[in-house]
Amino acid sequence: DALLWEKDFRASHLGTMDMTFRDFMDVYAAEIKPRIREHSWIDKEYIINDEITPFFGDMRMNEIKPVDVVRWQNELIQYRNKDGEPYSPTYLRTINNQLAAIFNHPERYYDLPNNPVSKTTRMGSSKGSEMVFWTKEEYLKFSEAIMDKPLAFHAFEILYWTGIREGELLALTSADFDLDTAELSITKSYQCLRGVDTITDPKTPKSVRTISIPRFLNEEMREYLELRDDLKPHDRIFQMTKHFLSHEMKRGCEASGVKRIRIHDLRHSHVSLLINIGFSALAIAERVGHESVDITYRYAHLFPTKQKEMANALHELREE
């Protein structure tokens, strides 16, 4: 045991791939954690600790083979929780991507000769289940059912009519609203990290943006903020948890009879609303803080087809 400990100690300090997977995770954490957002590391760490290390922990990095990866994948594919439900295809893909990222690191920086993940097929799927969203009529029925709680009502009004992310909503202060120009500045995001309220940078550089809000929403927020005399300019308006929003979503759906969707689906609902009105992918992307190519890819089935118009235009051009 003493000789084995010395071997592991020397491997981890020299950065050789004769170390165990568990020891390499300490090296990986030290080198990756400073380079990514804190909540991204927490998500990554959760998957590593719960889904990856229990299987690979005592194996040596240079001895892990593609067949080991396949056996690990099969365990996760066959997993069922206490209700008999499997992991979703998108979660399986996320776990697989984390293992791939782990092995890409020593392959790139520590000359790991064989990357076992690159030789296997990926499990899961990058495409989630069918996109679900509310029409305007469904949202109005829902919002009427939660009007008795002004904090929840105004939170959902902003989510549906602006399409901002949940974390962006929870970080909003009254200073972010310019009620004279009816504009809202998105410059930060809220996360609860290890039980601590934390304000972080938005998800991507594109996420920093100023968006115009409809006049009715501007007036709703003007009236609401006037009532909230407890707030200072830089206090968070919506001092609530994500659980509170989910609970209010459930309550409103049960009271109104509207189908249940996720909080994030309100963002999809906003995008589909703008597509139906006739706005372009580029204009929508600027509003919601996405790349226009992402909007085109994710919502392509919602955009009206121009194929007939193209064919007719080509016919007329040929006949000239």
PLM feature spans:
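N-terminal helical hairpins
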Residues: D1-M19, P34-R35
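N-terminal core-binding DNA-recognition domain of tyrosine site-specific recombinases/integrases
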Residues: A30-P113, G128, P150, Q239-H243, ...
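Basic, Lys/Arg- and aromatic-enriched nucleic-acid-binding interface segment
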Residues: E85-P89, R93-I95, R108-L172, L179-D180, ...
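C-terminal catalytic core of tyrosine-transesterase DNA break-rejoin enzymes
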Residues: T90, R108, L151, E157, ...
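DNA/chromatin major-groove-contacting recognition/catalytic segments
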Residues: P116, K141-A145, G195-D201, H301-E320
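Conserved tyrosine-mediated DNA breakage-rejoining catalytic core shared by Y-recombinases
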Residues: R122, A171-E223, D235
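Catalytic-site neighborhood detector that most strongly recognizes the C-terminal catalytic loop/helix
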Residues: F133, Y190, N218, H243, ...
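Active-site/catalytic core of tyrosine-dependent DNA strand-transfer enzymes
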Residues: K136-L140, S189-C192, P214-K259
